[in-house]
Amino acid sequence: MIAIVTDRPNVGREIARVLGADRKENGYMTGNGYMVTWTYGNMLSLAMPKDSGTARVEWKDFPLLPPSFLTVRHVKTDTGWNPDINALLQLKIIAKVLNACDTIIAATDASREGEMLFRHLYGFLECKQPCLRLWISSLTDEAITEAVSYTHLRAHETEL
């Protein structure tokens, strides 16, 4: 099974349609040997000191070295800054999809931002599967089919 991760639901659904992954699940599409899932933009952010159990930070506590520099995006509510529930739920779905697959295709934007989004997600979820990069310039059926063909997939050049 091959997992494809996009950075927007509409892109994921379009790629899934072209590849024949037409069975809708909660947060992803599956079928024809593919599981296509998506993020909602940046669902991860830098961890705050309180995320690593530090209630109050003083100069003597520096340098702060949290167990992870990334955490689930937080949103401001009446009770303060809390983890974004929607981001947390989608991250669990993405983790489930990636764990069920042998290969992962990064289909986020082919920009620094899109690459960073995928690499942060890959590291945060502690993925070990090999990754390929999908370079796509439009969402036409022909462009998607051509981009998914073996010659247009490139292995990540650096260790993730």
Predicted feature locations:
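A short, hydrophobic C-terminal helix/tail in secreted or cell-surface proteins
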Residues: A155-L160
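Intrinsically disordered, low-complexity regulatory segments
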Residues: M1-R154
